[in-house]
Amino acid sequence: MKSKIIVLSVIVLSIVSVNTQIKQETFYHPEFRETQRSASFGISTAYAYPPGVGILTNSPNCLSCHANNGPWKDDPNTIIDILDKDTKKSLKQADGTFLIETKKGEQKTVLTVIGNRKNNSIPASYRNAWLYIDPNTIGKSSLSKFAPNWDVNLPMSCRLVGDNLKGYEDANITSLPMTIQPLENAKDAEISLQVMLTQGEAVKNNAKEGMTGSYFERKVKLIVK
């Protein structure tokens, strides 16, 4: 009996210790300060904040929380591109929008490429963030904020700069694949690609301090062949 009590005491102390470490506040956004009762002995644990645009809040874009005060401008030195993963061909159109076409049920993988040219006086960003979102889904109950009836595996990311991609040797970039698939009821749609190039770290509970960033938006047209 004595040994069982000792074992139980060790387990309880271990859980308390782990939850004490987890419970440290790691929020940049005060509106996401929520606690949840853990299934283990009812001890509260804290959530770290997730992306706020249209997911946990009805914020229309990144600037609801972050400052648009970075040195990167919407000029030829800034790279925001979407490539066909197989051909590496840019899907950018003459009007500056992007066009992604695929058949119903067929998967299409693209590369999101973000960064800036090396041969200029503007420093490289440290971290790039991006989000593909259908603005019409913000404020609605749908869990997915991508175009309705389109499957997607990676609609958002926050990535350190330093990826290598043929054709972009003269730039500091991030590059990640995203696969989409129009389902049976999918229709043509227009979504928004929201991008931030950033340096520094945001201050806890105040995402407008400590981090500099430049915000950009691009229109992306999804076409069912």
Segments and roles (model prediction):
Residues 9, 34, 38-42:
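Intrinsically disordered, low-complexity segments enriched in polar/charged small residues
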Residues 19, 29, 41-225:
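Sequence context surrounding c-type heme c attachment/ligation sites in exported
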Residues 21, 31-36:
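Short, low-complexity, charge-dense intrinsically disordered segments
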Residues 9-15:
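Bacterial N-terminal signal peptides
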Residues 1-4:
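Positively charged n-region of N-terminal signal peptides that target proteins for export
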Residues 6-9, 54:
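Short helix-onset patch at the extreme N-terminus, typifying the N->h transition
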